Amino acid sequence: MAAITAALIKQVREETGAGMMDVKKALTEAEGDVARAKEIIRAKGIQAAGKREGRKAQEGTIASTVVESANGQTGYAVELNSETDFVAKTPKFVEFAGSVLDDAVKAEASSVDEVLAAASGDTTVKEAVEEAAALFGEHVKVGQFAKVEGPHVEVYAHKKSAEMPPSIVAMIATDEAGAAVAHEAALQISAMGAQWLTREDVPADVLESERRVATEKTTEELKSKGKPEAVIEKIAPKIVEGRLGAFYKETVLLEQAYVKDPSKTVGDLFKEVGGTALSFARVEVGKGDAE
């Protein structure tokens, strides 16, 4: 029997696209015979997993949880993608997404790369995902990952329909007082898709771009109405600031109108209970990098 070395495993993986554990098993069964191992892999349909990686996987589900931590609580959300919603809603796929989440939590992962590197039984999440592709017959991948920490963390998982798994997960970290309105804030995040917590969190380049667009649009509108340059220079800045204010109300969580009572903002909810929102995250299936 030929020795099953790392180089041999790498060779067969590169030639078949199969996962590491599948290659090890095939080589063991074939007693180190590469040609026979490749036949075993083909027979089991594992090779197809590598070929599927070039196909887009933008359906799927999001597994989420809250665990106790040194800082109080930590919320985790992991998106697992498939090619079709048919696969995404199967109990086995949802169960597998949950196992990936469990592995991420055990590893205290903070990024997609750390999730993929996390231990999963006697292999890694990356290898487990590759093997799942063969099981489900589709390209399967870990998509987005989010993590929030604070004294209190609230998680809300939204389903498009009863038979489908969660397609949006919203998480928010608050202080203890803010916990009283954290659920309402999580609902708001899910429904309205805020991008930043406060206006100070808006990146400078984003704000600069918005200001430039607002200025150009305002100037063109005033010119089209026949306003003289002197008038434009006088009134345009106020109009631009108004448009930036509208931008903040649309994209900044604490400045958004509360969906259940538009007469108040989300920030008002926290003021009413003397609480503070610390951070939040929103993950929606298919909204990460297309692949």
Curated annotation (Swiss-Prot):
Q: Name one GO cellular component term.
A: cytoplasm
Report which superkingdom the organism of origin falls in.
Bacteria
Q: List the residue ranges of the region (Involved in Mg(2+) ion dislocation from EF-Tu).
A: 84-87
Main subcellular localisation: cytoplasm
| UniProt cross-references to PROSITE patterns, sorted A to Z | EF_TS_2
Q: Give one GO term, molecular function aspect.
A: translation elongation factor activity
User: Mind listing the UniProt keywords for this protein, alphabetically?
Assistant: Cytoplasm, Elongation factor, Protein biosynthesis
Where in the cell does this protein reside? Cytoplasm
Per the record, the similarity remark reads: Belongs to the EF-Ts family.
Q: Which PANTHER family match?
A: ELONGATION FACTOR TS (PTHR11741), ELONGATION FACTOR TS, MITOCHONDRIAL (PTHR11741:SF0)
Looking up NCBIfam families in the UniProt record yields: tsf (TIGR00116)
Biological role:
Associates with the EF-Tu.GDP complex and induces the exchange of GDP to GTP. It remains bound to the aminoacyl-tRNA.EF-Tu.GTP complex up to the GTP hydrolysis stage on the ribosome.
Q: State what protein this is by name.
A: Elongation factor Ts
Q: Which organism is it from?
A: Bifidobacterium adolescentis (strain ATCC 15703 / DSM 20083 / NCTC 11814 / E194a)
What gene name is listed for this protein?
tsf
